[in-house]
């Protein structure tokens, strides 16, 4: 239940305490199959237009800030397309770091740190990772 897990925008007790969910029960609503398919197609089209799904990535790299849109700041900082090794800030959506083909974990982590430092330097904002980094460089 929401009260127990304290769900909020991209956060919950589950993510704070590194809990692994092994089982869940979902409550679904019935709907018209054609209407559901139409919505799914709409979401897929929107995702394809706005997100760099043609390249490997871990999805959205940075969380949206409380009072700012992180991807917008990254774009305004001129970092779209910025690359370290094979890791690049997506030109399609600045909130994604993509693998242009030969990125190493070190390339990606170095690019993340560079973006975080540039945003802090230019806008005095601290941006948070949405992805979880496991392991070391």
PLM region descriptions:
Residues 1-110, 117, 122, 126-137:
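Phosphate/pyrophosphate- and phosphate-bearing ligand-binding catalytic cores of soluble enzymes
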């Amino acid at each position: 239940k929401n009260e127990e897990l304290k769900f909020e925008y991209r956060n919950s007790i589950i993510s704070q305490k590194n809990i692994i969910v092994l089982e869940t029960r979902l409550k679904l609503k019935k709907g018209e199959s054609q209407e559901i398919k139409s919505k799914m197609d709409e979401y897929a089209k929107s995702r394809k237009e706005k997100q760099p799904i043609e390249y490997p990535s871990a999805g959205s790299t940075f969380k949206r800030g409380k009072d700012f849109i992180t991807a917008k700041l990254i774009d305004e900082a001129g970092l779209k397309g910025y690359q370290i090794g094979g890791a690049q800030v997506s030109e399609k959506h600045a909130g994604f770091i993509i693998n242009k083909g030969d990125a190493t974990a070190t390339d990606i982590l170095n690019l993340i740190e560079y973006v975080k430092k540039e945003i802090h330097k230019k806008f005095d904002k601290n941006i948070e990772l949405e992805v979880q980094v496991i392991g070391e460089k």
